[in-house]
Amino acid sequence: MLGLTEDTFLLVASDVHSSDECFEKLEHIAGSTNCLAFLYAGDLDIENYFITRSVQLRNYVFLPVQGNCDNRWAWTDVNLDLPLYRTCEFKGLRIFITHGHLYCDPSSVGLENKDFDLVITGHSHRYNISSEIVDGKRITHMNPGSPARPRGCRASYGMVVFGKDSVSLEIRALEGDGLLAQETIAVDNASERHD
């Protein structure tokens, strides 16, 4: 089954650009009982009726940010806030989400990079997982790529999988369920994480 796992996970995507077919596949994954939330890093282009209706009727937690192609006012029709960036925490993993066209990390909006474990961006339409050390702390960057308009790579989306003893970042192919990239990260106080 496309992208499903027995562990709890976060679905990560960006740059769908009004593709009904791609969004429907992502929604199938987000609707899994193991999916804690659908983190969306911009450029959904919600003027599409199917996508608008799907977001209104969703049965999952949807946390989007505004991309350079999103009309912020169109999102008011579906009662969703569409900030330029958002922060959240799941099971001890501190996350910063932005599209990447204006901001690329927490420090660009006056926050401390070291306060986050994972930075999620979109915009480039190319998947990537990389890490850097900031003030002695490892910060991982994840770009899920684009399931609709990939540039020089396969159509993709991301998953943050919470295993018993680890957090795995995965980039998966939209078609064929292939694993394209993976990295395991440590979370401070991981043993103290709770649902």
Report the location of each language-model feature.
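Charged phosphate-binding loop/patch that engages nucleotide di/tri-phosphates or the phosphate backbone
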Residues: G163-D195
